[in-house]
Amino acid sequence: MLHHMRTIINASWRYGNKCIVRQFGFSQTYSQLKGRDLLTLKNYSAEEIKYLLWVAADLKYRIKEKGEYLPLLQGKSLAMIFEKRSTRTRLSTETGFALLGGHPSFLTTQDIHLGVNESLKDTARVLSGMTDAVLARVYHQSDLEVLAEEASIPIVNGLSDDYHPIQILADYLTIQEHYGHLKGLTISWIGDGNNVLHSIMMSAAKFGMHLHIATPKGYEPNSSLTEAAKQFSKECGTKLLMTNDPLEAANGANVLVTDTWVSMGQEEEKKKRLLDFKGYQITMKTAKLAAPNWIFLHCLPRKPEEVDDEVFYCPKSLVFQEAENRKWTIMGVMVSLLTDYSPQLLRPTF
């Protein structure tokens, strides 16, 4: 990975009807990410994550607002390997990659059985000779790690049982668009200690964001990742609250977030989980404890037991803006990992 310095002048970033004013400064450092894998945000620095979001915001502005045609991925091909079903990840990746002039190829478990008909090692080497990148949606994080070790092209995590990094990038872009910054905000996660939460835990503190986590007993996030999150919080001077009380977690939060209580592969546990998560539904009672300017996010698909209609469909719910931003952030990731692109939009405030 190459690193270099880029001098820019921070001024105001106008997007739509918003004008985000920033302080003037010079010698902003960012990482050139071409050729990198994106398996987790744990090993991405704050500046690297911010750069991915910057590119996403730039592409959204230039393509959606200005109507530019940017064939940045012309001649590039992407292998999409999906062991798990998907709506938003598949659609955002296929449409986004094609919009930039690239060619995505979708492979299901009927087309490719990772590590079954062919070893992961061999699959990685075959894909490296035929495509420019791989986005894989798998059960086991270890499969992604083997692919990344053996492949000579970027491997992107489209979701695993451990992490969902591209979802969290969309969340951060949505929050930034709404508030104009991320630093100092408090995210409240109320629900299961799952892969989406793990990705928040590995990145929120790097933006200077505080994190409140409420899970039922027995559904806490991974213990080793909890320790890593505590260390990130300590290094970044942020607050990390972990509790079994959803109302305590909601107190003072700027962003209320939840997700499915029954992830893919856990269908047999549904009846037990619905009982164990009783009291964790996000309602206006929950929201009344949050900051006055709270917003609500959910990666979708949503079930009514997770959040009621009053919150889900209210003006403070940004779930559909969040869903759209899945496209722009995956486009930002692909452009960053496959090209030498430099954003034209002035760097947003984070």
Swiss-Prot record:
Belongs to the aspartate/ornithine carbamoyltransferase superfamily. OTCase family. Liver. It is found in: Mitochondrion matrix. GO terms for molecular function: amino acid binding; ornithine carbamoyltransferase activity. Pfam families: OTCace, OTCace_N. Induction: By thyroid hormone. It comes from the Eukaryota. OTC is necessary for the tadpoles transition from an ammonotelic, aquatic larva to a ureotelic, terrestrial adult. This is Ornithine carbamoyltransferase, mitochondrial. L-ornithine binds at residues 137, 195, 259-263, 298-301, 326. It is an enzyme of class 2 (transferase). InterPro entries: Asp/Orn_carbamoyltranf_P-bd (IPR006132), Asp/Orn_carbamoylTrfase (IPR006130), Asp/Orn_carbamoylTrfase_sf (IPR036901), Asp_carbamoyltransf_Asp/Orn-bd (IPR006131), Orn/put_carbamltrans (IPR002292). Keywords: Amino-acid biosynthesis, Arginine biosynthesis, Mitochondrion, Transferase, Transit peptide, Urea cycle. SUPFAM superfamilies: Aspartate/ornithine carbamoyltransferase (SSF53671). Homotrimer. The active site is at residue 299. One of its GO terms (cellular component) is mitochondrial matrix. GO terms for biological process: arginine biosynthetic process via ornithine; citrulline biosynthetic process; L-arginine biosynthetic process; urea cycle. It comes from Aquarana catesbeiana. Pathway: Nitrogen metabolism; urea cycle; L-citrulline from L-ornithine and carbamoyl phosphate: step 1/1.
